[in-house]
Regions:
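A short acidic, Gly/Pro-enriched loop at the edge of an enzyme's catalytic core
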Residues: 17-20, 84-94
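Helix-to-beta-strand junctions that scaffold the AdoMet/dcAdoMet cofactor pocket
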Residues: 17, 40-41, 126-128
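Mobile active-site "lid"/loop adjacent to the S-adenosyl-L-methionine
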Residues: 95-118
Length: 184
């Protein structure tokens, strides 16, 4: 069976540029933050966002334990406020929507309203040949609603400026899926 996490990184890898700027808009336990930190290298910059202190602490501990390059800024704030922190064009941006894995609190999730703002702003900030990956988890109510909202929103972007793709296991409607947005 296809591993969606591996597939996501296969799409992102050709867009990575040493010394560029990347963002993990939903830091969670720091998996993507760590991967981006290593990929961007010592001269790159990685911004990571989460609204939960637990996510920030877990990510910081992981980055330190894994001896990640000191190229990251961990931000305890909503990804919808990304423009307050990121001033440079983005090479790569990653969203893993939903709730904090392992927290046991499935009631605290990303929300359509803030996700819409964050995704719109992140797309606007993409550098030429930049890429944005958005993983959606429709197995819970808000995740399904976020997926519908993103389908509608992303389908309206000009094909002359962006390539927007969706990857989904079509015979498993509650399985995670993801969008890839590439700026031309």
């Amino acid at each position: 069976m296809i591993d969606l996490l591996t597939l996501q990184k296969d799409f992102i890898t050709p867009h990575l540029k040493e010394g560029a700027v990347a963002a993990d808009f939903t830091m969670g336990n720091g998996n993507d933050t760590l991967w981006l930190s290593r990929a961007m290298g010592e001269n790159g910059k990685v911004y990571a966002f989460d609204i939960q202190e637990k996510a920030l602490e877990s990510t910081r501990a992981r980055l330190e334990a894994e001896s990640a390059p000191q190229n990251y800024t961990l931000i305890l704030d909503s990804h919808s406020n990304l423009k307050q922190y990121i001033k440079e064009p983005l090479c790569v941006g990653m969203f893993n929507l939903g709730y904090l894995p392992g927290s046991g609190n499935k009631a605290l999730t990303t929300l359509r309203e803030t996700t819409r703002v964050a995704v719109t702003d992140a797309i606007e900030m993409l550098d030429h040949d930049g890429i944005l990956m958005i993983a959606v988890y429709p197995g819970h109510e808000e995740g399904a609603l976020e997926g519908e909202m993103l389908d509608e929103m992303l389908s309206k972007y000009s094909r002359f400026q962006y390539c927007v793709s969706k990857f989904r296991i079509i015979n498993s409607p509650t399985s995670p899926f993801f969008f890839i947005i590439e700026r031309k």
